[in-house]
């Protein structure tokens, strides 16, 4: 039996203290990790609701447990909104994460050891696009494509590899690429070899929803996404498709449940439904537009300060800084910036000579800072502070001054206070 009015603060002081410290960290640090964002209070409320108690294996109307009337209704709302938001004919809102959504797609359409063509992790792909340490690289034979010398996706290489290896699937999408993907050309290449085109739009789904980045659903057989990142919802996954291929839809559903998951997280699905509604508001497009403008302002500032931006530009929410000519590793840059309350992540650059644990670059994203109200002005300031620290990485005094500026700026743009 539990005490109904018990709170974390008066029951578990250790966990409560860490929760409060994390709250303060988010308020007092500038968050530039491209995959992180701040959810709304409505999304948080749904995730802390009584829906967390309900087990609901199966799909609406076909559950393995009773008492699912209301969670059925919630999941139907989430599905309807996801389809409307992305102009899809099919949506599965049950995946617990983007990685599980990707796993479900692979297992639905491929057999073990099938050949797959995906973007190299070191060139901007994701672990689930064929990394040898990930299930994708262990279960399937991945061939990797990358970027050309200008930093753009190398489509001639993709076509050459596709015709040489005849992959069962071509994977589009990325985790560290600042350009615009040519989904139409990828589909043309896939059709030339009778292959599936699967797109992972986890990083850019918010931009796609706002109509500011090409929608891959027009060309891909299947699309997955996370529901956080630019979409600004809870941490979770999503599978989408267009057309009327009922057989494909059934395969995808079966691959999620019972294929790789049991009971869905109904409190998270409710939060997804809310996030989808938020993404249909006019303000959401304004937000996404500012996300891009802030990223472009940061790229311009870094270039003006003598830093190399991979691809030389950005058309989305992120950019990759190449530090190979700055006598500093991505790992050290990450640590130095962290000491000044600026949060980035070390990231490999194309043809990186350093290990993924060290790297020659850092990845920077603008969804979170834009969510708290930063515009081009603040983005430019932050970029200059980053340069000040990295240009003087042995100067503790400069780092301390930047940290104070960060604290002052954060106080002007609170997240939840």
Swiss-Prot record:
From the UniProt record, give the pathway where this protein acts. Answer: One-carbon metabolism; tetrahydrofolate interconversion; Amino-acid biosynthesis; glycine biosynthesis; glycine from L-serine: step 1/1
Q: Which UniProt keywords apply?
A: Amino-acid biosynthesis, Cytoplasm, One-carbon metabolism, Pyridoxal phosphate, Transferase
What Pfam families does its record include? SHMT
A GO BP annotation: glycine biosynthetic process from serine
Q: Which InterPro entries does this UniProt record tie to the protein?
A: PyrdxlP-dep_Trfase, PyrdxlP-dep_Trfase_major, PyrdxlP-dep_Trfase_small, Ser_HO-MeTrfase, Ser_HO-MeTrfase-like, Ser_HO-MeTrfase_PLP_BS, SHMT-like_dom
The main location class comes to cytoplasm
Please state where this protein is localized: Cytoplasm
Q: Which reaction does it catalyse?
A: (6R)-5,10-methylene-5,6,7,8-tetrahydrofolate + glycine + H2O = (6S)-5,6,7,8-tetrahydrofolate + L-serine
| One GO CC term on file | cytosol
Recorded hits in CDD domains, A to Z, give: SHMT (cd00378)
Tell me the residues on which N6-(pyridoxal phosphate)lysine occurs.
Answer: 229
What Enzyme Commission number does this protein have? 2.1.2.1
Q: Does the keyword Transferase apply?
A: yes
Q: Which residues form a coiled coil?
A: none
Superkingdom of origin organism: Bacteria
The site annotation (Plays an important role in substrate specificity) covers 228
Instruction: Please list the disulfide bridges.
Output: none
The UniProt record gives the binding positions of (6S)-5,6,7,8-tetrahydrofolate as 121, 125-127, 355-357
> How the protein assembles, per its UniProt entry?
Homodimer.
**PANTHER family the UniProt entry points to:** SERINE HYDROXYMETHYLTRANSFERASE
> Function, please?
Catalyzes the reversible interconversion of serine and glycine with tetrahydrofolate (THF) serving as the one-carbon carrier. This reaction serves as the major source of one-carbon groups required for the biosynthesis of purines, thymidylate, methionine, and other important biomolecules. Also exhibits THF-independent aldolase activity toward beta-hydroxyamino acids, producing glycine and aldehydes, via a retro-aldol mechanism.
Q: What is this protein called?
A: Serine hydroxymethyltransferase
Source organism per UniProt: Buchnera aphidicola subsp. Baizongia pistaciae (strain Bp)
Task: Name the gene.
Answer: glyA
